[in-house]
């Protein structure tokens, strides 16, 4: 993945935070954009996908698709934001490409309601439609967050894991920390099942706290509760481990 695409992913993360949308809406935005990127990488010369207009600048097209991903994610999550709000955030956030790490600057004022704004609005509407076509109208999203919470509550309530409330809170926070990392990974967001990903997140968090024993009192591995196989579980753990910062 090139630096510009990584910057766009960072921009999506900050934009979602600025728009004050939920964790699940943010996850939806990332999954949608990663699905688009996957098709783009496989069909870079196919004008029926991301190259709906061959004369478009690639960077600008991807930037518009990133904005469209956020806009569509808000709709799908019933957290609708005005298209102007999405455009404002999109245009107000800029990158310092000369830095060793991604540096994001926030302009003091939103863009003016000039011709450029109306052109951008038309682009966002157009690219939302393009985005849907690119991903084959697949807007089904699974959330590893729910898997993490469901399994952890069962482990604690079933007394399979003994820990204090403070440790319990810390474990969940570790899961969310790892989840923030995997949002930047196309493999994690589009190739792993949400159930396997959620189990991997929880396993790594438990390991971090010295509590990683996947076998419960009934002789089963807790990841089997959500129909995750041993192979799938260990593959997911391996993939997620490589994304940890």
Q: What does each model-identified segment do?
A:
Residues 1-245:
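Non-catalytic, interaction-prone regions of core transcription and DNA-replication machinery
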